[in-house]
Amino acid sequence: MGRRAKMVEKVKTLMETHDQIRNMGICAHIDHGKTTLSDNLLAGAGMISKELAGDQLALDFDEEEAARGITIYAANVSMVHEYGGKEYLINLIDTPGHVDFGGDVTRAMRAIDGAVVVCCAVEGVMPQTETVLRQALKEKVKPVLFINKVDRLINELKLTPEELQGRFMKIIAEVNKLIEKMAPEEFKTEWLCDVANGKVAFGSAYNNWAISVPYMQRSGISFKDIIDYCEQEKQGELADKAPLHEVVLDMSIKHLPNPLQAQKYRIPNIWKGDAESAIGKSMVECNPNGPLAGVVTKIIVDKHAGAISACRLFSGRIKQGDDLYLVGSKQKARAQQVSIFMGAERVQVPSISAGNICALTGLREATAGETVCSPSEILEPGFESLSHTSEPVITVAIEAKNTKDLPKLIEILRQIAREDNTVRVEINEETGEHLISGMGELHIEVITNTKIGRDGGIEVDVGEPIVVYRETIMGTSPEIEGKSPNKHNKLYMIAEPMEESVYAAYVEGKLHDEDYKKKTTADGEARLVEAGLEKDQAKKVMSIYNGNMIVNMTRGIVQLDEARELIIEGFKEGVRNGPLAAEKVQGVKIKLMDATFHEDAIHRGPAQIIPAVRFGVRDAVSQAKPVLLEPMQSVYINTPQDYMGDGMKEINNRRGQILDMEQEGDMSIIKSSVPVAEMFGFAGAIRGATQGRCLWSVEFSGFEKVPGELQPKIVKQIRDRKGLKSE
């Protein structure tokens, strides 16, 4: 039996031993060393256990993988590591750190139970560190900390052992402050990163060494020894004495939970069904013999196998050929192949049980976040939808250069939308152009150049990037009458701003449209009251859509129940295009005050009720002091003090606002807020202004009101672009 086959057998055995499984991710700010760490953990584990292969074979195996150009970035890898005389199966997910790819991070968090948060020793805690930590804690994923690039503190900043420890303590304190602020109540203390018990490791992923306090006590290596090894350029020797993979994986096995432990508290957080039902209990217990329940966390497109769904199973088992049911798309599917991820390849296995991460082919209609179950035992409701910390803020129009490529382009766009639910794809009915909305310039570039151009082989014309605006209201409208085209049905409504706390709860993913579709559920009502809506109104919410809500304040109107679905559809159509520039409306509450309907049902059908509500909503919004909102980004610049003035000038020239400034040694950290519309070309400009000496990053920070003096000009530009008549 070859070493690969032995490894697969080892993984198959461990998959059934839940307390010896760790589903973990690596996440960090961009360029803090995630992928280097992932690659070296993989190399260190030899992708096979040491006792099976010996060092020589492990190296051969790794070189063979390297020759294939393996990069496990944003991919899933199963590997085996020995700790305390036992072997453990580690399912590792590496996540991207660039702000434009935050969606990948969110999806990965649903699959894992623990995360190694990587933080650069030189830069410290950065915006994306906070973002990925927030996403992890929201999904009840337990963190441990790896402080990377320690060699740079020694060789570049020449820190003494005392200064080194001081820098570590500062980073740990900042991370713990974030954990205390954002962790679930029951874990605020338990999940803090404690150096003494080994929840923190320090090292250099690039030079393949790491250390933790328990490892220092065991091995006798001190901070002074580490400085000596680095200064004398003997990091190779240090890597032999304190191998990166051993220290980081030991820490992960000791401190991160197995699926049996994690699912007890994670399932109630991501599934809102009946905890006492058979499937509810089975998921909490991670029962491999219970009803099937899993969630698709990523769609990977393979030229030969087609769409591959990476799936985390919480209950039951999937075998090749099993019939499956996709709850979100309400479709049946068949598991054509069931595999595990082994580096860049997939290895077929007969079945996968609860607590594991697997690769499934055959789920053609699946999207990231889809709930998978058995057609004979449908999981209702499905898992909570994945909520992202950012949303698409830039749109481009694309057209195939060659019209014969159009069907292929449509298929690729459908595939991209399934793979990445932070991308919006729409067709402009008037021009026939495809509109793609993404998280930023880089996100759009990757879609158009890489996914459509390189992978799809289609040449496209890409339009100028357009910023996505929103509309909202600042006042309350008078009572407005919405009249049906036949004049026999009248609905009376008021538009007013939604309570800020309720809108914030919606943005944070605490309110879901599903809870209000047929009739407000008790859970839905409780969430609204908790968010700050009056109890009397919470019972009467008819729909929540795109951050807007409609509340039925009428009494005793018999036909209203029959017309409910039509009223909701009219409301949705009414808030899709605001009165100023036909941009989406957000933060608006429509109160339905009264209604009169024709007694004959034939005269109150969809063609009558939907337009009546749509026109009423639009009219009410237009009379409630509508304003335009623009997307904002937090911009962080880390620059030598000599260039601080240039950095600030660059922000001020872009309608930016300086929020805070800090000095750290000879570096200045500028924290600011800048409109997305002013950020085009920022990368080149800031590099030029600071002669390439600065580090910078951005993060979506929500929508803000456009300054009053600029609103007419921007509204006119949008209306002209859309071919709408001037106001």
From Swiss-Prot:
Entry binding sites for GTP: 28-35, 94-98, 148-151
Cited Gene3D superfamilies: 3.30.230.10, 3.30.70.240, Elongation Factor G (Translational Gtpase), domain 3, P-loop containing nucleotide triphosphate hydrolases, Translation factors
Modified residues annotated as Diphthamide in this record: 603
Pfam family, one: EFG_III
Annotated signal sequence range: none
Gene Ontology cellular component annotations, sorted alphabetically: cytosol; ribonucleoprotein complex
Keyword Protein biosynthesis: yes
Swiss-Prot/TrEMBL keywords: Cytoplasm, Elongation factor, GTP-binding, Nucleotide-binding, Protein biosynthesis
InterPro entries hit by this protein: EF-G-like_DII (IPR053905), EFG_II (IPR041095), EFG_III/V (IPR035647), EFG_V-like (IPR000640), G_TR_CS (IPR031157), P-loop_NTPase (IPR027417), Ribosomal_Su5_D2-typ_SF (IPR020568), Ribsml_uS5_D2-typ_fold_subgr (IPR014721)
Family note: Belongs to the TRAFAC class translation factor GTPase superfamily. Classic translation factor GTPase family. EF-G/EF-2 subfamily.
Role noted for this protein: Catalyzes the GTP-dependent ribosomal translocation step during translation elongation. During this step, the ribosome changes from the pre-translocational (PRE) to the post-translocational (POST) state as the newly formed A-site-bound peptidyl-tRNA and P-site-bound deacylated tRNA move to the P and E sites, respectively. Catalyzes the coordinated movement of the two tRNA molecules, the mRNA and conformational changes in the ribosome.
Protein name as it appears in the record: Elongation factor 2
Organism: Methanococcus maripaludis (strain C5 / ATCC BAA-1333)
Primary gene name: fusA
